[in-house]
């Protein structure tokens, strides 16, 4: 019987395509991964400006009065405002809609066009937000930012997975998540310094500064080539063959090119990719496209990264200290993501998922205990001793590092690499849509939940971390070292998913199961 969850490739009948990690493909993937900057910058910048007094006074005066009132006796509820929540969460609803539209554009016109749309729309949103004079302008700008993120997040992970040699796909794809973390860090640093600008207009620089990462991905999408997979899908066979040789750095690409053509021919037989997603043989893929982004958001990470300054201010750090603490967590996020780049193709996806889950679970429980011990259930305000603040920040940083080398990058990598070409664009849109929907939900209810659940909010998220770790252990196959167009084979050997997939669905052979889900050394 197959080992629980593990579907490692073997050296037997697994195809091995020749190719190297060339400078060309490395530079191409690095430029494309810059699409993550816009998402990361927004996550970092928005939470920071909502902790700036000048921003709150101009757009959310009721929140500012509540925050400053001496009679306030509940630290947990000082930021509870539906208007403030709508400012932060409207972006994700727009991103959800855009990701569905992006599926058709990505499939019919190529990955890079969707990346271009993402950059242009995000740039427009940044201009409106930086010049905002009323709340409606802020929300309009956020909606345009969301459209940009929806297009970029749908296309960039696909681009990276298709462009990278299969042996290095994990590391190159995680460049997208690394760019997200760099965007968060840069935003946190800028917030810290812009908040000190006299006159209270630093928030305009923070919001308007989003133009910079938007211009990077816009220009990048104009100079990048499209992927061989996308070229073949659109009938550009000769260009695709020549491009594949350059990408792989070898002349012998016949076998891989032939397999890509066959995959494209199969995909053209599919008239309705959205409807095809519901077929029984795609049940495993669809389950992962829904479960992974759902669980990723229920780790609570966007609560930490998006609302970090607000959260730290709430638990007694003060405004400047809160912004600096957010910078510290941003630094941890970047360096921990680099660990994932090193380890994802060495240790595998499942190991990182499970280790990160255990780490996050322990840290959330400790943070909940620390906050509960300090503020209790009534949220009574008071100064936070320095040593206490250090302990809270330390365990939040350990929590962030656990996410940064597991659910952060793998939440984008695994869904983008498991889909066959005929449903890949549609399935990636499902993945992004689910991600954005639950990001919207969490952002919409977080401040309310903080007010009512208090320190129990961290217990709430830790429960889902436990559930998602169990899910990964039993239901997620190992996808390390498998060519992207061969990925369907892993489901045939899985102890559970094999009941939905038959030999006729993937007629080109199978993959053998290793003991205890371990990957043989010859991979």
UniProtKB/Swiss-Prot annotation:
Keyword Transmembrane: yes
Membrane topology classification: Multi-pass membrane protein
Localisation: Membrane
GO molecular function, one term: symporter activity
Record carries keyword Transmembrane helix: yes
Alphabetized InterPro entries for the sequence: MFS_dom, MFS_STP/MST-like_plant, MFS_sugar_transport-like, MFS_trans_sf, STP/PLT_plant, Sugar/inositol_transpt, Sugar_transporter_CS
Predominant cellular place of this UniProt entry's protein: membrane
Keyword field: Membrane, Sugar transport, Symport, Transmembrane, Transmembrane helix, Transport
GO CC term (a single one): membrane
Family, as annotated: Belongs to the major facilitator superfamily. Sugar transporter (TC 2.A.1.1) family.
PANTHER family, alphabetized: SOLUTE CARRIER FAMILY 2, FACILITATED GLUCOSE TRANSPORTER, SUGAR TRANSPORT PROTEIN 1
Official protein name in the record: Sugar carrier protein C
Organism per entry: Ricinus communis (Castor bean)
